[in-house]
Amino acid sequence: MSERLPRDLEAEKAVLGAVFLDSALFDTVAGILDEDDFCLTLHRWLYHAFKSCVLSGRLDTVTLSAELEKSGQTERERGLAYAVEAANALPSLEHAAVREYARIVKDCAVRRELILKYEEAAGLLRDRSKSVAEVTDGIQAAVLHSEKGKGGLV
């Protein structure tokens, strides 16, 4: 596929910056997003580290650094610097705005997932290894389950 899959790196960065500045926002964000909804690997592992810190009771530069080191992240300094950069670049810390940033990230994640599922279905239809009914059922299941991050084709 030559086209880039849907993503909004600014929204991802805004979500991370918001949670880093106010860890109480993690619950708001976690109700919408999963770690795998982030497009960039750096964003995914920072979100994972934020989650671990929040669940441990404190998210700050010291606990984040320790969590990144504990999880074996070789680019700990880059992760810390990026978290601070994301916090400084945050357009708004209002709960409604942060919720909207999270929804944008989720929307892009669902779109990526559906595009990949449809491409998989197109491949199955081309090579005729599955019946049309099986592929159609798989597509319908993928669409129904895409927002929950579950489901697959046939």
Model regions: which residues?
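Charged, low-complexity surface segments at secondary-structure and domain boundaries
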Residues: 1, 50-52, 121-128, 151
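Noncatalytic partner-interaction/assembly domains of nucleic-acid and motor enzyme complexes
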Residues: 1-110
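A general boundary/transition motif marking the beginning of the first structured unit of a protein
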Residues: 3, 7, 17, 127, ...
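Extended, charged alpha-helical coiled-coil/arm scaffolds that mediate oligomerization and mechanical coupling
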Residues: 80-142, 148
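Phosphate-handling catalytic cores of nucleic-acid transaction enzymes
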Residues: 148-154
